[in-house]
From Swiss-Prot:
GO MF term set: 4 iron, 4 sulfur cluster binding; 4-hydroxy-3-methylbut-2-en-1-yl diphosphate synthase activity (ferredoxin); 4-hydroxy-3-methylbut-2-enyl-diphosphate synthase activity (flavodoxin); iron ion binding
Residues reported to bind [4Fe-4S] cluster: 298, 301, 344, 351
InterPro entries assigned: Dihydropteroate_synth-like_sf, IspG_bac, IspG_bac-typ, NO2/SO3_Rdtase_4Fe4S_sf
Protein name per its UniProtKB record: 4-hydroxy-3-methylbut-2-en-1-yl diphosphate synthase (flavodoxin)
Species in which this protein is naturally found: Neisseria gonorrhoeae (strain ATCC 700825 / FA 1090)
Family: Belongs to the IspG family.
Length: 421
């Protein structure tokens, strides 16, 4: 695992999950169901949790939504899911919390946007009510500032001051500073209102990668609160994945960031869980956490005109993901398993030996056999039409043998009984 130095922060306890400092970076997601539909929302939270989301944010934007939050919590508890719920409040959060006190109690964290709680004295009163409600209910708060909904009175104040400055900055730099000031001033107000410092998480979201990196570097240097990372809108498909990865990987490598959410625009027909998988893969490929056994596979070249190794690599990765909901409980540590599926003799044997389990499929013109390596040693050679099912059986047996309750994986060599296939 990556041993990079994490940024030192307060630690915030959100139910059973610790956020900040040396605690693992937490994966967060958000539903896109109508929160007023308690059944559909609870089922999507279950789906996101099964995929690996450790906290889930839900929209609380209307009396109908607020009235269903406690029911959503009960439904999840009845299904055996303790996933913390984050209430996403904008514009009318104080009214909803006042009218539906059970909503505030059922949530584990409130997300408050200081840019749209209201203006002037009235806005201050609304903010104060939400903060005091969180404190009374012993709930954490994320003060989430967004570029698109920045407090305009603050922005104007800072722009006016910049105009008369002896060394004026470009307007975009003033706006970035305004994001940071909004978050820090709001956190200061929250503490004065009675919310403990170890109940506060901050975020300053923008949509451009370079801006996000700049803002969070500065924000992280000026406070000791845990930070939630994510682009406001990353986009759709590969663009969204690349943008999120480019931004978050830089910050995480510098030790900045304690919770993350990948704000992907869902493609038609794609599962909501994709944002969870992308977040996990960012953390896992950086060596920060392990969630699911990883498959190493070569990209293919002229030596691998067959698609067999590509299909097998996909089958193995899908199989491992499907099994994790069961394996996570039965076989602690299995998430660190590494499997190699290689396409020819050039790098196949070497990569397969480095993995826990590896298979080197024949390339174009090579002998149609596939040697399997277990813990660096060649154990069996597969051939014929059942290579995929036979290899998956070997993986399954390896997991049971090396990660089962009666095994001691860390204290003895990995072994697997290879039967004649």
């Amino acid at each position: 695992m990556n041993t990079l130095q994490r940024r030192k922060t307060h630690q915030v306890l959100i139910d059973h999950i610790t956020v900040g400092s040396e605690a693992p970076v937490v994966i967060q997601s958000m539903t896109n169901t109508d929160t007023a539909d308690a059944k559909a929302t609870a089922l999507q939270i279950k789906e996101l949790s099964d995929a690996g989301s450790e906290m889930v944010r839900i929209t609380v934007n209307s009396p109908e939504a607020a009235s269903k939050v406690a029911e959503i919590r009960r439904r999840l508890d009845d299904m055996g899911y303790a996933t913390p719920l984050i209430g996403d409040f904008h514009f009318n959060g104080e009214r909803l919390l006042a009218e539906f006190p059970e909503c505030g109690k059922a949530l584990s964290k409130y997300r408050i946007n200081p840019g749209n709680v209201g203006k002037g004295v009235k806005g201050d009163e609304k903010f104060a009510f939400m903060i005091r409600t969180a404190a009374e209910n012993d709930k954490a708060v994320r003060i989430g500032v967004n570029w698109g909904s920045l407090d305009q009175s603050l922005a104007k104040r800072m722009m006016d001051a910049n105009l008369v400055s002896s060394a004026p900055k470009p307007p975009e730099e003033v706006m970035k500073e305004a994001l940071i000031v909004s978050a820090l001033e709001s956190a200061e107000k929250a503490v004065l209102l009675g919310l403990p410092e170890d109940k506060i998480i901050l975020s300053c979201k923008v949509s451009a990668v370079h801006d996000l990196i700049q803002v969070y570097r500065e924000l992280g240097s000026r406070c000791v609160y845990p930070l939630h990372l994510g682009l406001t809108e990353a986009g759709m498909g590969s663009k969204g994945i690349v943008a999120s990865t480019a931004a978050l990987s830089v910050l995480l490598q510098e030790g900045i960031g304690d919770t993350i959410r990948i704000s992907l625009t869902p493609e038609p027909g794609s599962p909501r869980t994709q944002e969870v998988v992308v977040g996990q893969e960012i953390l896992q490929t950086m060596g920060l956490r392990s969630f699911t056994p990883m498959v190493t596979a070569c990209p293919g070249c002229g030596r691998t005109t067959s698609t067999v190794f590509q299909e097998l690599a996909q089958d193995v990765q899908n199989y491992l993901r499907q099994k994790m909901s069961i394996w996570r409980t039965l076989y602690p540590g299995v998430e660190s398993l590494n499997v190699a599926v290689m396409g020819c003799v050039v790098n196949g044997p070497g990569e397969s030996k480095l993995a826990d389990i590896g298979i080197s499929l024949p390339g174009t013109g090579e002998t149609p056999v596939a040697p399997v390596y277990v813990d660096g040693e060649r154990k069996v050679t597969l051939k014929g039409n059942n290579i995929a099912s036979e290899f998956l059986a070997i993986v399954e047996e390896y997991v049971k043998t090396n990660y089962g309750k009666n095994s001691s994986k860390r204290n003895k060599g990995k072994v697997i009984p290879i039967q004649s296939l």
